[in-house]
Regions:
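CN hydrolase (nitrilase-like) catalytic-core segments centered on the catalytic cysteine
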Residues: 1-81
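Cysteine/selenocysteine-centered motifs that mediate thiol-based redox chemistry or coordinate metal-sulfur cofactors
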Residues: 2, 91-109
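A short, polar/proline- and glycine-enriched secondary-structure boundary/capping micro-motif
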Residues: 20, 83-84, 103-106
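Generic alpha-helical secondary structure signal
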Residues: 21, 25, 88-91, 100
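A short, polar/charged loop-to-alpha-helix boundary motif
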Residues: 78-95
Length: 109
């Protein structure tokens, strides 16, 4: 976001337990912090992992606006989700709350 990105693309494979508890909250927080659109492709379903043990994933690919509104939630079924975005929304959000301009490194000033 500091380098000028308007969209963050995030691949993911959360488990059903951690996904249900944290998924949407974490992604909405990333949108708030960066004032970017956050577009997340998430694995869904059951997958064969090492040693033949099944691994389940949460799904719920999301599109989140720079103001943290969930624009689309793909649920747990496989498929494609389309969403219209306007990158002007990024500029508007960053003007309303210019959080990135106050970011400072830790340590000696």
């Amino acid at each position: 976001a500091k380098a000028g990105a308007d969209i963050m693309l995030v691949p993911s494979a959360f488990s059903p337990v951690t996904g249900a508890s944290h998924w949407e909250t974490l992604l909405r927080a990333r949108a708030i912090e960066t004032r970017c659109f956050v577009l997340v492709a998430a694995q869904t379903g059951t997958h064969t992992a090492r040693a033949g043990k099944a691994r389940k994933t949460y799904g719920h690919s999301l599109a989140v606006s720079p103001w943290s509104a969930v624009l689309a939630d793909a649920g747990t079924e496989r498929g494609v989700t389309l969403v219209d975005i306007d990158t002007e929304d990024v500029s508007k959000a960053r003007k309303r709350i210019p959080a990135l301009t106050h970011d400072r490194p830790f340590g000696d000033p």
